[in-house]
């Protein structure tokens, strides 16, 4: 079974039946799943940062969508930081778990953090998204590529083109798909610890299990049964578009071994070892298609946890500024941090 073969590098010496059972245990764990770790109830960003809380109308989704926003100055490009499977309705996980606003303050890049979208893959769903909390409309791709950039251009002087999408876990594949199909808006895409071949092997079944645990959603409501929509949203099958677009890519994945950054728990170690295989396959496909505009950051450590996703977002800052043509120092004044 292909699924079990993936784990031989992540978990050794484990009988076949126990390995299969461990898959379900890891995916249904309250710790991570394909989720992006656990979260606290308050934001990380310190008082004094010029972070705004916007309510952006979405006709496609029939409601206002909360956006956490930090301006990079007039006519600045944007960095869309996309959340994991367990995205909350109060704050974006990047603000809950990292000082990302601090890292990019005065960078010349506007930081855009959509709030909500649990289990959504930031996609336009075939059917209403029905879960434990009831039913809602998920048209996230339409919102991110049409409604939100138009709002930010009109109200916050953010360029509607030439921006970046970076996502962790669930949203890593989403960022690549956004760049594949919307190359003018997203010239840069970053994927951190994502499953990059979701339509392959048992991908749809495992994603369905994880979505059921993270909100009670059904994968069939998202992209239907196996078929064209799953393939359309599979980065490993859309490599040709990314190469043809000359999208700038940053692909990160650890190997399931913890370092001093933490994440030393079985689900975090197991999941990172699992998704690494799809990342290596994506790199092979990208190189085979003639790609030459990507950073592949495959560390000899790293588990499925926030400290390992914060590190590459800091590391790619200069590359983002150069690629997007940002003007460092632009943006609203910031109060100094207290000692």
From Swiss-Prot:
Active-site residues per Swiss-Prot or TrEMBL entry: 169 (nucleophile), 272, 304
Cellular component per GO, a single term: cytoplasm
Signal peptide segment: 1-43
This enzyme's EC code(s): 2.3.1.122, 2.3.1.20
Disulfide bonds: 130-135
Stored InterPro entries: AB_hydrolase_fold, Esterase-like, Mycobacterial_A85_antigen
Region of interest (Fibronectin-binding), residue spans: 101-111
Positions annotated to bind substrate: 85-86, 169, 197, 274-277, 281, 304-306
Superkingdom assignment: Bacteria
Gene Ontology MF annotations: diacylglycerol O-acyltransferase activity; trehalose O-mycolyltransferase activity
Reaction equation(s) it catalyzes: an acyl-CoA + a 1,2-diacyl-sn-glycerol = a triacyl-sn-glycerol + CoA; 2 alpha,alpha'-trehalose 6-mycolate = alpha,alpha'-trehalose 6,6'-bismycolate + alpha,alpha-trehalose
Keywords from the named record: Acyltransferase, Cell wall, Cytoplasm, Disulfide bond, Secreted, Signal, Transferase
Pfam families membership: Esterase
Compartments reported by the entry: Secreted, Cell wall; Cytoplasm
Family statement drawn from the similarity comment of this UniProt entry: Belongs to the mycobacterial A85 antigen family.
Free-text function comment from the UniProt entry: The antigen 85 proteins (FbpA, FbpB, FbpC) are responsible for the high affinity of mycobacteria for fibronectin, a large adhesive glycoprotein, which facilitates the attachment of M.tuberculosis to murine alveolar macrophages (AMs). They also help to maintain the integrity of the cell wall by catalyzing the transfer of mycolic acids to cell wall arabinogalactan, and through the synthesis of alpha,alpha-trehalose dimycolate (TDM, cord factor).
PANTHER family given in the database record: DIACYLGLYCEROL ACYLTRANSFERASE_MYCOLYLTRANSFERASE AG85A (PTHR48098:SF1), ENTEROCHELIN ESTERASE-RELATED (PTHR48098)
Subunit structure: Homodimer.
Record-given protein name: Diacylglycerol acyltransferase/mycolyltransferase Ag85A
Organism: Mycobacterium gordonae
């Amino acid at each position: 079974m292909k699924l079990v073969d993936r784990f031989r590098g992540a978990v050794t010496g484990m009988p076949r039946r126990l390995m299969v059972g461990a898959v379900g245990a890891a995916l249904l764990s309250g710790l991570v799943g394909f989720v992006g770790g656990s979260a606290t109830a308050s934001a990380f960003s310190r008082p004094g940062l010029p972070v705004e809380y916007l309510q952006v109308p979405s006709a496609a989704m029939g409601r206002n969508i909360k956006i956490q926003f930090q301006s990079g100055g007039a006519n600045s490009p944007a960095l869309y930081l996309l959340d994991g499977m367990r995205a909350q309705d109060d704050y974006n996980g990047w603000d809950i778990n990292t000082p990302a606003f601090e890292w990019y303050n005065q960078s010349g890049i506007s930081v855009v953090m959509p709030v909500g979208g649990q289990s959504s893959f930031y996609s336009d769903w075939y059917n209403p998204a029905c879960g434990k909390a009831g039913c809602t409309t998920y048209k996230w791709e339409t919102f991110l590529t049409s409604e939100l950039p138009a709002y930010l251009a009109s109200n916050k002087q953010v360029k509607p083109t030439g921006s970046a999408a970076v996502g962790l876990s669930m949203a890593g594949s989403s960022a690549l798909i956004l760049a594949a199909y919307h190359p003018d808006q997203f010239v840069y895409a970053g994927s951190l610890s994502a499953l990059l071949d979701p339509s392959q092997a048992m991908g749809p079944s495992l994603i369905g299990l994880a979505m059921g645990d993270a909100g009670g959603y059904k994968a069939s409501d998202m992209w239907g049964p196996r078929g064209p929509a799953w393939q359309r949203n599979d980065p490993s099958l859309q490599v040709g578009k990314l190469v043809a677009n000359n999208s700038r890519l940053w692909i990160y994945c650890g190997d399931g071994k913890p370092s001093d950054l933490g994440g030393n728990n079985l689900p975090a170690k197991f999941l990172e070892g699992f998704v690494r295989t799809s990342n290596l396959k994506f790199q092979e496909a990208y190189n085979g298609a003639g790609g030459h505009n990507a950073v592949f950051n495959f560390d000899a450590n790293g588990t499925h946890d926030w400290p390992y996703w914060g590190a590459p977002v800091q590391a790619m800052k200069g590359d983002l500024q150069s690629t997007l043509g940002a003007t460092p120092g632009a943006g609203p004044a910031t109060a100094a941090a207290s000692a």
